[in-house]
Amino acid sequence: IAEGGDIPQFCDGDDGYVLNLGGPKLNRKAELIAMSQIFEDKKGEKPGQEEITEVEFWLNQFCNHSLKSSMLESAAFPDSGYYLLQNTNSYNVSLMFDCGPLGYTNIAAHGHADALSFVLRIEGENILIDPGTYDYFTYPEWRSYFKSTQAHNTVEIDELDQSVMKGLFLWDQHAESSCDSWEVDSNGGKITAHHDGYLRLSDPVLHTRTVELDGANSTISVIDNIDCKKEHRVKMHYHYDHQCQVNLVDSHTLEIRSKRNAITMILPDEAKLTLTEGSDKTFLGHQSIGYHHKVATTSLICELVINQPASFTTKIQWR
């Protein structure tokens, strides 16, 4: 479900497992998917990892079945609410979009307030990331941050979460997301979705987001529509992988560099941009790459104030 690297991180993950047969610690989700393909005798994409796990190795001896990598294509997973936009013509670009439920059952214990967020990988390198989980009980303030809307690549209204956080594993007034349209082609495709989490405000706010991957022109367009009647503070958040270098070029343009990629982000002219580097004094600018393991990274806040319906476009281009 993504070209190169681990399976994208969404919601909680604590690196837990029941039995270790002595192999290296690899992505458990990728391992489980690979195992399911063996049992179901599906010859498909080997997900997430290049190395074969010990579990796969032994199962393959008995099942006489091997998994081979194949070219990814854009795909919809409507039951979960995840949608993959994949360019198959030139650059390997994977964009995973989230418009699924907040979480399981009415408490959504392991859910994060990340409706309409997305993660981006180009040529096997993570560019825009989900921050991960980091902690469950030891550091409640960090637990709250990593679950929050501001910690994800989506829009925050009036510094409030999309859903109402009632505890470390408890949510109330769940934001409901819905896919409005889904179109794909060999260059990527386009998805439009909305969520109703901010309709609970005294002046209800509806957030609709369209994301289009145009691989032929090496461009991603993100269009955020905010429907309201009174004044609101709008923050678009973007979080970059810790291996990326992020710099402001001018008042509305960012340059992101990784080992193999040079990427430009063009934000709305009317927005105020603030880059935050992770430190002991801020929650923003942190990425959890394992349970109880966090590293400093760069986060962007793109801030605007509106008092009527508004639309904002962000462009992501690479070379």
Go through the PLM ranges and name each one:
Residues 11-58, 133-134, 138-319:
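CBM-like, beta-strand-rich accessory domains located in the C-terminal region of large
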